[in-house]
Amino acid sequence: MMHLNRVHLEEKRAYWAMVMPAFALYLLVMAFPIILSIMLSVSNYSGGKMFGGEKWGFAGFSAYARVFTDPWFWNALKNNLYIVLISVFGQLPLGFIFAYFIYSKIVRAPSFWQGVLYVPNIISVIVVGLLWQVIFSPHGPIAEIVNSIHASSFQGQLKAIFDGAGGFSLSDNVIKKILHLAGPSGQAMFSDPVPELRDLLASYNGQPISEIYTALSNLFVQKWSPAFLTKTDIAMLPVLFVILWMYTGMYLILFLANMQKIDAQIIESARIDGANEGQVMRYIILPALSGTIVNSAILAISGSLSSFALIFAMTGGGPSRVTEILSIYMYNNAFLGRPNFPLANAISLIMVLISVVLIVLTKAVEKRYGGKEE
């Protein structure tokens, strides 16, 4: 009996010896920061004596009250909700549709499209943010393409004017047509448009006609300078587009992997019985993927509250804080200007609470509609 007790005791010791390191690591990495964050959020901590701050003491829930009365908190929360919506109702449906196209072999070279759509997920988030910042910049590729199209169109119309006159001409009719093509802004460049433009064209005489077209288009065609990330009324739209573009491929892979688990004979039998593609999707594929859809929605919601790196690289929360999200709002309060650690920790805990509420709602919807988690 004593031998059995000793063996049992040794088994317990071995069990705790294996569990305790992992448990201690959990306390250090997860539990301790959460407890510390709660303590800081209800304190007046301002860096401690080491950093010239006040003595640490209890301050109640003043930080939470300040968060909820700050209009910038509601602005950041609104932007986070936009990201949740574009993630759940944008990334998931698109990922599902693309996965179905590849699964059903509706598109050619499905492996190629699978790889292309997944590529954004393997690129560094910071690199993606900086890349799209350049693309959307006033002198980026979008602006260059649009301006080159405008210039080509203008030069084509110039060519038609000169061809109609039998070649390069300084006649009043040609001058007036060019001024009409240039529009009011072009005409406003001259105090006396017809003779001044004739003198300008005369100075080009003898040059290759293509260079004349280029010179006139540079003079009269106004450069379009997009301000996608600097206009307060539209700055959030390109951010949402990039988020949609970047993560749709991840859900494509999740949905495709689970579609491939469905017994092909079931789908084939349904088609033999007369089911069309819509019925196959509705009655076979969607029910089979209900758990995956819910899990993907939870993943999308949690990811929507952690978009700090991408938006910080693209806009920094600007212009005028219109693209600021909760994580950037928290960062600004913690590290910019005079740090407010209680406020920043209160924001972080509110973010956790929002995430939990959204996930609980998602699980409730799953339960309501009979989904089964895989």
Question: Which sequence ranges carry the predicted segments?
Answer:
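A structural signal for multi-pass alpha-helical bundles of membrane permease subunits
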Residues: 7-374
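N-terminal leader/signal peptides at the extreme start of proteins
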Residues: 1-7
